[in-house]
Amino acid sequence: MQHLEAIYHASGIQDQETEAFLNASQCNLMENLHSSHEDAALKVLIALADEQLEILQDKQHMVEFMIFLGQQIVRTKAYRDGVLKGLHRRNDLEVEVADAVAHSWWFLSYMFGMNIGFSFFSSRQDSRHALLVNDTDIPFITSDHPVVNVHPCVSETELSVPEYADFYYPISPRVAYIICDSERFTSGKHNINEAIVNEFNSKVAAQAMVHIVGNSDSAIRPFKKHIGKRYKKNDNTPS
């Protein structure tokens, strides 16, 4: 596909039908790949939602789930915008590189997701992987940015790369998965209290771009005020 696209651009011809075909082919290819990762992880997600953490003792299931999480991280507007915003445009070469990255994002994002997923898998003995069980009256919420870094070092005033990461992924209103650099949770299963649920829901909302999702209006109402807070603060920061 990239070879065909290169030939088309080298020809100097501009044809809307050809460009539409190339774009559709790219989208279909990537959607099929993403669908395959989602299908592979579905069995794991169902088991984890039922608190069956032991399913991840199977190496294949662990690989599939880690790749799924990696792709969930990169398939967001927040991640894309953050990467592109970090690219310099101080000279012609940097502009060319930045434009190339933006143009190839459909492919690069997939490779970034695979790398993140492999990193999760290969470092699984060093990080702490935990299942969080929420039996409080406050359900977990999720958002258009489904995997968030809830480590305390994450700044709410600037979009800088944090030194550490506690990657948190809500699976259902009652169950979430977390991969910790910190020692906040040891590996295994943990029942958590309302204070932690409120903290994580607030961070999910703050790192959402537009939408938060819950199992009821009452579940999301207290957190609407936090939506996009991290990005709004950065928009108001002088450059």
Placement of each model-derived feature along the sequence:
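Alpha-helical structural context detector biased toward long hydrophobic helices
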Residues: M1-S239
